[in-house]
Structures are given as C-alpha cells and as structure tokens.
Design a protein with these regions (language model features):
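Bacterial N-terminal signal peptides that target proteins for export
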Residues: 1-8
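Short pre-active-site segment immediately N-terminal to redox-active cysteine/selenocysteine motifs
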Residues: 31-37, 80
Length: 128
C-alpha cells in the first residue's frame, strides 16, 4: 500500500510539472483583475480562440500578473495588461501589448505565429 501511494504521488508530480513551465507553443495572456481590455478580449476573442487554427497551434493560458508566473525567458518585463506573449519551448517569440479589437488581435497573432519554427506551426492551415 505504501508503494502504491508513492507511485501515485510520483505520477501526479510528473503530470503537474508541465503546468509550471511553458513548453511547446502557447500564448500566455498576462492579465489583472479589473482590466477592462482583458474583459473585452474575454468577450470578443476568448470563447473561440482555442478552437481557431491559431489556438490549435498556440493555445492561450491565463497568467495573473500578481500571481505565480510560468518559467519563461521574457525579452522585457510585463508592464501593461493584457499582454499576450507567444512562447515556444519556454522562450518568448513575440508579444502583443494591449487589446483594441478582434481584427487587430488576429492579424497580429497571425504574424507572430508565422515567426514560430515550422514544426511548431504544423497545425496551422496554409490559408491562414
């Protein structure tokens, strides 16, 4: 029984480790409570982003600027919210500071995803 408990704890710890680090391609959305632009993104983009071709390549993960942060090599500090940081293998590829509208967001994220290595972009259709 003790061995089983140790095995379960070990497996659970191994599964939780990737949550602490940004790996593969993902879009980190740094946000804070009370941010009106974060709320606008949540309303206009959030519901469909992870199901879009861009979201399949770089799913979004919410990061509270006042909470625990993933281990990512950022090019500069996070100052504004929202700030969207595209990362690949825990390294910043590029970012979008602020949110104005759906069209600007998707146009900019398309450009950023185009900077990913080809293997990371493999889920993106040629038409986007």
């Amino acid at each position: 029984m003790r061995l089983l408990r140790i095995l379960i704890i070990t497996v659970a710890a191994a599964l939780a480790l990737p949550l602490a680090q940004a790996s593969a391609a993902e879009l980190l959305m740094y946000r804070r409570d009370g941010c009106p632009y974060c709320v606008a993104w949540d309303r206009e983009v959030g519901p469909g982003y992870n199901n879009s071709s861009f979201g399949k390549v770089a799913p979004v993960r919410m990061v509270d600027v006042h909470g625990a942060r993933p281990q990512v090599a950022l090019k500069s500090p996070i100052i504004y919210t929202p700030t969207f940081v595209l990362v690949d293998e825990a390294r910043e590829i590029g970012r979008i500071e602020g949110y104005s509208n759906n069209d600007f967001f998707y146009g900019t994220i398309a450009r950023l995803i185009g900077q990913l290595p080809a293997a990371a972009r493999s889920g993106l259709s040629a038409s986007q």
